[in-house]
Amino acid sequence: MNGTIYLCHSSCDLLNAGTLESYLKKVADWLRDNPYDVVSLLIGNGDFIKVKNFTAPIQSSGLIDHIYTPKNHSIALNDWPTLSEIILSGKRAMVFMDYEANHDEVPYILDEFTYIWETPFSPTDRNFPCDIQRPPGLNEADARKRMYIANHNLNLEISIAGANILVPNTVLLNETNAVSGFGSMGAMAGNCTGTSSLPPTRYSIYLHRLEKWNRPPNLLLVDYYNIGNVNGSVFQVAAKLNNVTYNGKCCGRTTSLASESLIARLSGKLEMIYSMIVINILVMTIL
């Protein structure tokens, strides 16, 4: 509406979470209130909106004061700043975009696939294969030079009015977001890393294929981070990958679906960067 960007999922008729500017203001306020935390935003620009359209809400929200801008746009895997360096710089927000990012036009909105590759998106397979899906055509040698995202948000295909759409598989959330067990986030992280504790089964060949990365995912993307087999299970997995202990209380829900429709994404280990919460803005629509 009047050129304003809204946060929508697939269609604003399905989910409209308000304007981008209002959301980014909440992020900016949170960063000011939490001076030792780091946030990364991954903008899913499914409508292929030109990157310059995002500068106004970023600036008006106040987030611009916190955004990290790299010195160059060919950062090697081990050259990203550490957590302490990010905090001391005061630039504690990293903004990535999957499509239409342009470093020359807006240097602080980072092109996701220049730095990161992803496992299969919107997975429906509980095996959660750790193969390269995006960007298409990326070879293994180049993938080893980049960070990677493990998509661990289990989906279910349903038909509405003759159209097939994917929705979160909420029935299995406790298992999907669990610390361990088949289909769990902990199991996928271990499989990608090459530290799976699952016994030899018919999946042995599959697991052997996954062990080639020999490092944890840099980001773990989940639906409903506040649901799991134990309180804070997704944070426990991320903590384990970072070789630390999670002592927080998270969100209090372990058995029921959150009433709100917020979809948050949680990071895993970032040896060369930091631990962070990733909010994935799925679709940006100008109404």
Tell me what each language-model feature is.
Residues 260-287:
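Cleavable C-terminal sorting propeptides in eukaryotic secreted/cell-surface proteins
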Residues 2-257:
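Catalytic cores of phosphodiester-bond hydrolases, prominently lipid phosphodiesterases
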